[in-house]
Amino acid sequence: MIFSKQLKATIMAALFTGTSLVTMGITSATSNTVVHSAKRVQTEHKTKPSKVITSTKSTHKTHTNTPVASRKGQQESNSISSKSVVRYSQEPTVRVLLGSRTETLPVSLSSGAKVVGGKTSFSATGDLKVTVSGNTVKVNGKAVGPTAHIKPIGVGGAFTALGQSYHGGLKVIARNGGMRLINEVGLEDYVAGVLPYEMSPSWPQAALQAQAVAARTYALNNMAKAKGQDYDVTPSTDYQVYKGKERETQATRKAVQHTQGMVMTYGGQPINALFHSDGGGYTESAVNVWGNDLPYLKGVKDYSTHEGTRSWLITTSRHDLEAKLRAAGKSVGSLKKIELTPMGRAPLETRDRGISGRVKQATFVGASKKVTLTGDQLRSILGLKSTLFDFYVNHKPSVQEKPGRSYHTFTRKNDVVYILGHGWGHGLGLSQWGAYEMAQKGPNNGEYYKKILNHYYTGIQIDKWY
């Protein structure tokens, strides 16, 4: 979306709910268990939100950190390619890794299907049973080969597997005595399967349209990185949430169709279109999260005013804070003070805070030693919604706390510690609640989604790619 994949401990969703953050490892499948194999090597923890923080709201649901802003973003070079825009002659296909499995896989077809693999090809209808014997995939007992493609035919052809219905086809790869399951689906149907899980279908069309373009762009960016791999994305907040066709609505499909083929580019290439639930008043620059710069991910004013995500307050204690540091292997003994620049009004960057005020690092000084932790580490250890926060020892702050005052010194054993924070998610790219507010106030002219995107992504172009 958006740690994600770093905090990815929160990281995708993101970009939104704030309870998932991220990074998945490959685990071997057992019996009927479906496992998402790990994303290609990543250097950040799952904050998927943190994929670690992903939460769902009732009426207006957003995945707080989707896609996770994991270190995945660090794979991008500081210099953006200036190659000319390469458009597709037709809609591209996305490969979504649904999981891995060792037991028989039941597959139901909405219509007929062609089963293809190697030199084998036959028609099938109804319910199928997919198994693996050695390095051979079998469909209804017929050997197909090391790879089988189940391709539904007819308009609206779809299949159901693993409890979900999907557009497109199913690719099954025999692997280590089990099978790897990949949904091969047109990009537009993929985006339609992402949108209702990343943004409430009841939101204004301009917000849904902006999210659709972000989801499409994010997918294309990852497809470019996945050359030579079995798949492009997973259906989790490690990337962005995708659960097939069942939750599509007229509103979400309309937003996808209205923006069909529209993609955000920088230097002629699809951008890493991260998004998150709520920027908390100001989004962050990539350089302050990853240490390298992406010119289109700059901190900007966020228009969210949503209660519960724009600002939040946690009450804890010195004892609890010491215990959490100890449990994380970061014990400093009895806390004396926290070295951290007091939270100010954005934009205002300091050595330990980004332009939005998000914590880059904080030092905990104790009786035995001192430890410096990154904002993402603290978000994970303390279970925070974002890294835009400050500590207040024995002082209960108001949401509109006057900036600049420091309350970071511990004076007694029963010190009360308040943590005032803003936003939900990694803070990079599109703020979903900010998009909602802009769409609520903007014109319903079919073009306003572009203004939303141009606000949250700096210096981009929005092009028709197919």
Identify the residue ranges that each predicted region occupies.
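Conserved, single-site charged/polar hotspot
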Residues: I2-Y466
